[in-house]
Amino acid sequence: MEVSYKFGFDAAHHFDNYPEGHIYRGVHGHSFQVEVALAGEPDPKTGFVADLGEVERACRDVRESLDHRMLNEIDGLALPSLENLSLWIWRALKPRFANLARITVRRDSQGQSCTYTGR
């Protein structure tokens, strides 16, 4: 069984590894959507796979670290691709949730997404 929580944030980034004049090289921003999924069987005492209030609080911390920031300036996001952003969020949340199953980061306006499952 899987439960999930979604949140969004807006941030800017650039990719210095692209040639001069390439659209990705310049600073630009996106609205990102994140889905955090936890898997397991419901706890017989609570009926929950995870306390979604606790998940929401943890995601609020992640959101505050990313929202309206230059992603390149955040430790571990020098190359802020969807892939690296998914991994960064995983690493931020995994210590708090042993049953973390997947992180999906989307840029819906671009039709793009990346899902990381710990492998």
Name what the model sees in each region.
Residues 1-119:
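Charge-rich, low-complexity N-terminal segments
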